[in-house]
């Protein structure tokens, strides 16, 4: 990690910048060697897709699916146009937030050659490419929100409150205030990609706000937070060297392990209670328990390679089974549904 890098200053090259007119031993202009190699449009598109960290999109898609399922079971409404528009809007905000994270982690000297995200470190993309792509995605999200306003019965002030609340959370996680760097990132993600996203998908469909979608979002929010916590625990040493503070750094390795297990297994306790007292269909998420134990063993052995990606996969499967369980539950068996 480039510990000598000045915070807020982007240092792309490892050595000194070649001066105008400098040549190598073969007589070639050194400035030409600093340029990125020409790549095909397919390679360029693949680079943009990888920069979005698509493996993390389960944190966006499952809340949208859950909110839509709650709307269907409680009010009997499900407009496919609103479902697609909501999914694209949330994915756009999530992807843009990932790009903001990439940009600011690099500019603060946090990302390095051994980091999981080396989009800027390896010059896969240039900083200005990441910025422009992020602006495009935020704009796309706003366009989708405008379309949702035209199609949904939800009041403008309610739609704007939820949507721009989520957008602000995705940006301020590392941009602006930078909640991630002051141990508040976990709280932001827990709210944004849990209750807020579920409420957004639900309200867009039914045209009103309610409290019960926030309650149903709790198991999914805990699972999503497990993804972030595994990522922060893996990066604990590099984050500490960069001078930032995350929850994983504050509580240390032992309590981080305890917290990860709590986030991992508490949803299963909730599903067991619901399956026992409400509907057996809510036992479907329990099919993913073996995967959860596998992740626990990997965390305990401190083998953090690909742990966030594997936790995100569990988050996706658990969320889908949860949604199917709600849809399959008999009418009146679940509270408010």
Curated annotation (Swiss-Prot):
Chain positions found as N-acetylalanine: 2
Keyword Transmembrane in record: yes
GO BP annotations listed: circulatory system development; endothelial cell development; menaquinone biosynthetic process; phylloquinone metabolic process; ubiquinone biosynthetic process; vitamin K biosynthetic process
Pfam family, one: UbiA
Example of a GO MF term: prenyltransferase activity
Annotated compartments: Endoplasmic reticulum membrane; Golgi apparatus membrane; Mitochondrion membrane
Keyword Methyltransferase assigned: no
S-S pairs: none
Pathway(s) this gene product operates in, as recorded in its UniProt entry: Quinol/quinone metabolism; menaquinone biosynthesis; Cofactor biosynthesis; ubiquinone biosynthesis
Superkingdom in the source lineage: Eukaryota
EC number: 2.5.1.-, 2.5.1.39
Major localization listed first in the record, in broad terms: endoplasmic reticulum
GO cellular component: endoplasmic reticulum; endoplasmic reticulum membrane; Golgi membrane; mitochondrial membrane; nucleus
Reactions accelerated catalytically: menadiol + (2E,6E,10E)-geranylgeranyl diphosphate = menaquinol-4 + diphosphate; all-trans-decaprenyl diphosphate + 4-hydroxybenzoate = 4-hydroxy-3-(all-trans-decaprenyl)benzoate + diphosphate
Keywords: Acetylation, Endoplasmic reticulum, Golgi apparatus, Membrane, Menaquinone biosynthesis, Mitochondrion, Prenyltransferase, Transferase, Transmembrane, Transmembrane helix, Ubiquinone biosynthesis
TM region positions: 82-102, 133-153, 159-179, 187-207, 208-228, 244-266, 276-296, 314-334
UniProt membrane topology term: Multi-pass membrane protein
Subunit structure: Interacts with HMGCR and SOAT1.
Family (UniProt): Belongs to the UbiA prenyltransferase family.
Record's function text: Prenyltransferase that mediates the formation of menaquinone-4 (MK-4) and coenzyme Q10. MK-4 is a vitamin K2 isoform required for endothelial cell development. Mediates the conversion of phylloquinone (PK) into MK-4, probably by cleaving the side chain of phylloquinone (PK) to release 2-methyl-1,4-naphthoquinone (menadione; K3) and then prenylating it with geranylgeranyl pyrophosphate (GGPP) to form MK-4.
Name of the protein in question: UbiA prenyltransferase domain-containing protein 1
Species per Swiss-Prot/TrEMBL record: Ailuropoda melanoleuca
Organism lineage: Eukaryota, Metazoa, Chordata, Craniata, Vertebrata
Gene name in the database record: UBIAD1
């Amino acid at each position: 990690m480039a510990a000598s890098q000045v915070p807020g200053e982007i240092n792309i090259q490892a050595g000194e910048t070649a001066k105008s007119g400098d040549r190598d031993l073969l007589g070639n202009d050194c400035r030409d060697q600093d340029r990125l190699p020409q790549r095909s449009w397919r390679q360029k598109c693949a680079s943009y897709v990888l920069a979005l960290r698509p493996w993390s999109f389960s944190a966006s898609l499952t809340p949208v699916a859950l909110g839509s399922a709650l709307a269907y079971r409680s009010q009997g409404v499900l407009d496919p146009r609103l479902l697609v528009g909501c999914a694209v809007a949330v994915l756009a905000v999530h992807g843009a937030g990932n790009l903001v994270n990439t940009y600011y982690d690099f500019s603060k000297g946090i990302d390095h050659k051994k980091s999981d995200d080396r989009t800027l470190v390896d010059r896969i993309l240039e900083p200005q490419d990441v910025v422009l792509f992020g602006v495009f995605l935020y704009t796309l999200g706003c366009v989708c929100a405008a379309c949702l306003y035209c199609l949904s019965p939800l009041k403008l002030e309610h739609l704007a409150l939820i949507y721009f609340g989520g957008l602000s959370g995705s940006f301020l996680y590392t941009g602006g205030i930078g909640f991630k760097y002051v141990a508040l990132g976990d709280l932001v993600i827990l709210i944004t990609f849990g209750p807020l996203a579920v409420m957004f998908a639900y309200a867009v469909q039914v045209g009103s706000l309610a409290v019960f979608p926030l309650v149903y979002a709790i198991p999914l929010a805990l699972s999503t937070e497990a993804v972030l916590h595994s990522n922060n625990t893996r990066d604990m040493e590099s984050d500490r060297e960069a001078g930032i503070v995350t929850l994983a750094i504050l509580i240390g390795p032992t309590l981080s392990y305890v917290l990860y297990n709590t986030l991992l297994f508490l949803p299963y306790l909730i599903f067991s209670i619901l399956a026992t007292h409400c509907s057996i269909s809510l036992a479907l998420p329990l099919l993913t328990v073996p995967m959860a134990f596998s992740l626990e063993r990997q965390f305990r052995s401190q083998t953090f390679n690909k742990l966030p990606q594997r936790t995100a996969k569990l988050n996706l499967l658990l969320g889908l089974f949860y949604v199917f369980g709600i849809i399959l539950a008999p009418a009146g068996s679940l509270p408010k549904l």
